[in-house]
């Protein structure tokens, strides 16, 4: 089966992105042992053959999800991940959270949809000039509300149902997102470093989840997979 998987990244690309550097050996999760190649100068070195295989499996899965017409939710709120998560999700026409995970995003989706509708309605009212009929103070208050909602929900606009899969940069930091996705039965694809627990992750991509270049590389590959799946869907409907 592995031979049939798309080979979407090279060892060289991974090395250049620093994807092989794990955490100090005293900060590891023993469950990551199968993904570790060796230790050097007190740092675990990730087995990049496993990274290639993990990304290939994740790529194929994401392609299948978007080919069915479902969406991917990209999640990465750590500073190093914020820009890549937003830009790659937008490029692929998917959803993202890159500032703060709000509890209940997946497990209390009915409330989430109401907030998204409120944001949409307020922006619509502003854009057609309704705010001009209000006092300056009232208009400023509503603008502030739009800004506040956008800080949390900008990447979720248009999301009217739960995603078909979730892609996470650093599941240790995004523990709440992992728990909610697991509870809702949403498959999880994640960049998993040597200090993480891989057990809740359906598609483990073992790699450095702190290096900006590594995060950009992995996130862009997942975005490519989403785009490929959407193209397949379009072709099948022609």
From Swiss-Prot:
Alphabetically list the UniProt keywords.
Ribonucleoprotein, Ribosomal protein
Q: Record's GO cellular component, any one? A: cytosolic small ribosomal subunit
- Supply the PROSITE patterns for this chain: RIBOSOMAL_S2_1, RIBOSOMAL_S2_2
Looking up Pfam families in the UniProt record yields:
Ribosomal_S2
**Alphabetized Gene3D superfamilies for the sequence:** Glucose-6-phosphate isomerase like protein, domain 1, Helix hairpin bin
One GO BP on record is:
translation
Which cysteine residues pair off into disulfide bonds?
none
GO molecular function annotation: structural constituent of ribosome
What family is it from?
Belongs to the universal ribosomal protein uS2 family.
Which NCBIfam families does its entry note?
A: rpsB_bact (TIGR01011)
The protein's matches in HAMAP family, at most eight in alphabetical order, are given as:
Ribosomal_uS2_B (MF_00291_B)
UniProt cross-references to PANTHER family, sorted A to Z: 30S RIBOSOMAL PROTEIN S2 PROKARYOTIC AND ORGANELLAR (PTHR12534), SMALL RIBOSOMAL SUBUNIT PROTEIN US2M (PTHR12534:SF0)
Give the protein name, as stated in the record: Small ribosomal subunit protein uS2
Q: What is the lineage of its organism?
A: Bacteria, Bacillati, Chloroflexota, Chloroflexia, Chloroflexales
């Amino acid at each position: 089966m592995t031979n049939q998987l798309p080979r979407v990244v090279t060892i060289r690309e991974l090395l250049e992105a620093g994807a092989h550097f794990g955490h100090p050996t005293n900060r590891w999760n023993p469950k990551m042992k199968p993904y570790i190649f060796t230790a050097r100068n007190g740092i675990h070195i990730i087995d990049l053959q496993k990274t290639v295989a993990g990304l290939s499996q994740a790529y194929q899965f994401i392609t299948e999800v978007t080919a069915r017409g479902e969406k991917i939710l990209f999640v990465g709120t750590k500073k190093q991940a914020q820009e890549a998560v937003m830009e790659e999700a937008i490029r692929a026409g998917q959803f993202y959270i890159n500032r703060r995970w709000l509890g209940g995003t997946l497990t209390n989706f009915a409330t989430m949809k109401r907030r998204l509708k409120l944001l949409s309605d307020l922006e619509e009212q502003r854009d057609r000039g309704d705010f001009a009929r209000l006092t300056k103070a009232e208009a400023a208050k509503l603008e502030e509300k739009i800004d506040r909602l956008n800080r949390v929900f900008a990447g979720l606009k248009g999301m009217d149902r739960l995603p078909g899969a979730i892609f996470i940069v650093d599941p240790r930091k995004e523990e709440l997102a992992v728990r909610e996705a697991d509870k809702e039965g949403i498959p999880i694809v994640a960049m998993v470093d040597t200090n993480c627990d891989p057990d809740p992750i359906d598609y483990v991509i073992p790699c450095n989840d702190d290096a900006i270049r590594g995060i950009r590389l992995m996130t862009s590959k997942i975005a490519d997979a989403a785009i490929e799946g959407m193209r397949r869907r379009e072709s099948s409907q022609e």
